[in-house]
Amino acid sequence: MAIPMSMAMATPTDSVSRVWSMSSLKSALPSTASLRLPSSSSRRPVTLRLPISSPSLPSFSGLSPVNPLLSIGLPDWQSFENGFKIVDGGGRIYAMRHGRRVPKLNRPPDQRKALLRGLTTQLLKHGRIKTTRARASAMRKFVDKMITLAKDGSLHKRRQALGYIYEKQIVHALFAEVPDRYGERNGGYTRIIRTLPRRGDNAPMAYIELV
């Protein structure tokens, strides 16, 4: 079978152009790479081999362990260079609230808040009330907070107290009397006195009063 002259002359030209293109590709690659070209009879793809080096990762300088012995024996790119730094300029470190139990008082959050606000208002109005021990213990910190706001006496603190206490007259009386009554006392403005259980459900009861 006779081969056309055009096909016979096209084969060397294509091979030359192919060799020229692969040579130009080899010259364009970095000097660190080794390129292996296949022979003219082989049709396997070109394999490119690059040197593999260990990753040069920067050392982590964030939340490092408090104990510097924990970083001994680690590679340079895994070791902690800086210790655990505590921010001095008013910074805070937050953690999870493990064990911080909130008294539920068998109420949803909105009803529980309203209950504590009402108990605080009644205690500041009458000076002494009788309730369950759980409620007395839960409302104690809110009563102390209102008295602390009244000791400050500023307009901002007064508005905060008006947003919590239900009766406006109690707030004005509180801000007028607290500085003279608790001016020298730092905390501990209430007292809880246990009493007999409630008749019917036997719930533990207590009196809570202002000191």
From Swiss-Prot:
One of its GO terms (molecular function) is structural constituent of ribosome. Pfam families: Ribosomal_L17. One of its GO terms (biological process) is translation. It is found in: Plastid, Chloroplast. Residues 1-95 form a transit peptide. The keyword Isomerase does not apply. It comes from the Eukaryota. Keywords: Chloroplast, Plastid, Ribonucleoprotein, Ribosomal protein, RNA-binding, rRNA-binding, Transit peptide. One of its GO terms (cellular component) is ribonucleoprotein complex. Gene3D superfamilies: Ribosomal protein L17. PANTHER family: LARGE RIBOSOMAL SUBUNIT PROTEIN BL17M (PTHR14413:SF16), RIBOSOMAL PROTEIN L17 (PTHR14413). Part of the 50S ribosomal subunit. Belongs to the bacterial ribosomal protein bL17 family. This protein binds directly to 23S ribosomal RNA. This is Large ribosomal subunit protein bL17c. It comes from Arabidopsis thaliana (Mouse-ear cress).
